[in-house]
Design a protein with these regions (language model features):
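C-terminal-of-GTPase-core extension/linker across diverse P-loop GTPases
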Residues: 1-14, 22-24, 28, 32-190
Length: 190
C-alpha cells in the first residue's frame, strides 16, 4: 500500500483556512498560519469553522469559538467567519457567496480622492499627535488593489508608527467594508 505523505502547506497558499472547531492541538497553528497569510502575504481571509456536528447537542458554537480564540480577538474582529459542517452540509449554501463577497472586497477599486478626503475629514475630527507634533498628510494615493495599497506623503513620515497606522486602518476598514482584507500602507516623505 502507498502511504500518504503530508504535503507542506505554504502559508501564502492558504487564504481560506478550514479550522476543526474540536481540535485544540491544531487550533493555534491554524490561526497563526491565517494571521501570517493575512499580515505578511497580504491574503484576504475567510475562516471556516468545521465539524459543528461533533459539538455537544446544546452547546453554543459562537461561545466556544470566542473562548478558544480570546487571545486572537484583534484578528477575529476583522475577518469573516462561517460555521460549517462538511458531514451534514450545514451552512454549505453560505460558502460560495461569502467567498465571492470577500473577493469583491479584496479587489474593490476606490478613488484616491475619496480616500484622501475621508482621511482628511477624519484627522480634522481626531488629530494624531506624536512627540507633540500634529501629524499631517499632504497626499494619499491608491496604488493597487488585491490587497488595497495606499501611499501617504507626509512631512512627518518618520513619526507614523504602528498605532497611527492602526488608527487609519481601522477607520478605513469600517468606512470601505474591508472585512477580511489586509490593508497595506506605504508612508513616504513629501
Amino acid at each position: 500500500k502507498d502511504k500518504k505523505v503530508p504535503v507542506p502547506i505554504k502559508v501564502k497558499d492558504k487564504p481560506v483556512p478550514i479550522i476543526d472547531i474540536n481540535d485544540d492541538a491544531l487550533l493555534d497553528q491554524d490561526i497563526t498560519l491565517a494571521i501570517k497569510a493575512f499580515e505578511d502575504f497580504g491574503k484576504a481571509i475567510l475562516i471556516i469553522w468545521n465539524k459543528l456536528d461533533l459539538l455537544p447537542k446544546n452547546s453554543d458554537p459562537l461561545k466556544i469559538i470566542k473562548e478558544k480564540t480570546a487571545k486572537y480577538k484583534h484578528f477575529f474582529d476583522i475577518v469573516p467567519q462561517i460555521l460549517f459542517s462538511a458531514r451534514t452540509k450545514r451552512n454549505k449554501e453560505k460558502l460560495i457567496p461569502e467567498i465571492k463577497a470577500l473577493w469583491a472586497r479584496y479587489s474593490q477599486r476606490i478613488d484616491s480622492k475619496e480616500v484622501y478626503l475621508y482621511i482628511k475629514e477624519l484627522l480634522s475630527q481626531k488629530s494624531l499627535f506624536k512627540i507633540q507634533q500634529k501629524l499631517q498628510i499632504q497626499s494619499l494615493h491608491v496604488i493597487k488593489t488585491s490587497p488595497p495599497t495606499f501611499v501617504i506623503r507626509s512631512r512627518q513620515y518618520a513619526l507614523f508608527g504602528s498605532s497611527e497606522v492602526n488608527f487609519l486602518t481601522n477607520h478605513l476598514r469600517k468606512q470601505f467594508d474591508f472585512k477580511g482584507v489586509p490593508i497595506i500602507w506605504k508612508i513616504n516623505n513629501d
